[in-house]
Amino acid sequence: MVQDVNALRWACVVLGLATVSFLTACGGSPRTTPPPPQVAVSIHPQGASVVAGFQTQQFSANVAGDPKNLGVSWSVDGIGGGNSAVGVISSSGLYTPPSSAGSHKVTASSVADTSKSASAPMGVTDLTGVSTYHYDLARDGVNSHEFALTTADVNRNTFGKLFSCPVDSAVYTETLWVPSLNVNGALHNVIFVATQHDSLYAFDADAAPCQQLWHVNLIDAAHGGTSGETSVVWSDVGSGFKDIYPEIGVTSTPVINPSTNTLYVMSKSESGGPVFYQRLHAVDLTTGNEKFNAPVNISATVSGTGDGSSGSSVAFDSRSEHARSALALVNGVVYISWASHEDTFPYHGWIIGYSAANLQQQVGVFNTSPNGGLDGIWMAGGAPAADASGNLYVATGNGTFDADQNTAPNTDYGDSTLRISTATGLSVTDYFAPNDQATLSLNDTDLGSGGVTLLPDQTSGPPHLLISGGKEGVLYLIDRDNMGHFQAASNNQIVQSFFADNGSFTTTSFWQNNLYIAGAVQGGTDNLKMYSFNPSMGRFNTLPSAQSAHSFPFPGATTAVSSSGASNGIVWAVDTSCYGVPSPSCGGLNAPAILFAFDATSVATELWDSSQAAAARDQAGNAVKFTVPTVANGKVYIGTRSEVDVYGLLP
């Protein structure tokens, strides 16, 4: 028996057995081997977007509980290493996109434990650029090439402010975006931003922190300026309302010709006297230098005896005219539109066209009230729309109207929506004026406070439709081929009219047969509303199909829609009610803009807004009136008083 015990003890010593049963038998305390560490994988960034055929995206992964440091294997849409259809990812996590657009999933899987992985959504866009106001000549406000921002991913946990780009003054222009641009020998996605200090900036659209590529001032000697020239002091042109304060330089959104890498932009400035200058510039996208015989000093004269006329002609006045509407590029011609500064007399609405290839060549001049006055083309910064034939469509605000008269003068178009031919010069070929035009003008409830949107061609009813609306809150659905002119008794000559909002200072958006509008007049508020269009009837349901819980104070919001074709529609809108002096909604105070995202299938569903996150994580710069969001390649850009703010999927 003693020999058996000694033998067992010797076996315990020699074998060093660690099982509970043997330790107990050997007279030791029970011990257990600790379990292996739990494997966990994380991926960075948590979502991304690239341009097809140009950008790459570097992913990294961290594996906890991997003592042998075996790392990860990479796949795209479940395909190890990916392929040419979904994109290729290297062993180091560098993703190279396919040549076609789409949404993909990049996955990092632990080698130590293949059941553990982490994934990130990967959007690949084929968007060729945002080269003009509201995306296209229809001014429908839709980017249907957005494959990174989805209704599932735009929320406070995964979406927010990425970075800001500081600028020298307020940004009233919409941000424009160009992909794959060679600047100083390197390819960048680039955003272009203009300010009221007459500055123009090019920034890398993706780099955080912000990377400035170049900056020019449009009134220096290299850009046609004279000695001592400055941006315009607000009090030198206004009536004391401080609508744009404290300086006026570039107000209208530029336009880009991507085929020549040229940006066209309007500047306003003054020098001692004061003497006022308005110039159209043609700027090289890669350097900021002038080209195409630019700049050109704006000057024009039309026949007429209207306000400010001399003899039998009306001349363009560089002091009183204000290029508020965005520029349009149509068939090789750049068109600029004007109204007034704070209704300072005398003024007219003007449209002037210049050859995009030679700015010294003026190709068309149109005045909305050559024998009257107080007309203007404001459209809350919206651009003239244009159809496939090159016709321009604009809405005018207030002023003289006599186009319905059978005898001359009958060329004044106050409170009208116009079709203007560009075939030879500029001439009105059709128009619509509401039956209460005189009342609109008398009460300053002008039609032209809102922009014009062209609807897609229809297969039932009139094939060519447009939407126009103003301060009265009525939307007019008009047949572009037969606009209806003026009818004193009613507006029955047009396709449809209905009260849609509190008053429009916006350009509407139209996506998947839904119209989006957030309108509000001074002192009022209204919700973002969506109206359904019935293509078989060729008309709108006059009751909103959905509306937001948030109510937008004056001036409402011009929306933009991003989507992946017909899916993942998101409506973006900026509350700019605290835009500063005079901002009736905020008692003249200036406060941050608030960017909102809504589900485009029902705007009653708010996905996110920039005031939600704690510690002001997503707070924008101080608001500017009529700001339009630009969505491109997984990011949203908005201009403010001192910076451009960039939002996207959080890293």
Q: Which role does the model predict for each range below?
A:
Residues 66-82, 119:
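Short, well-ordered beta-strand segments
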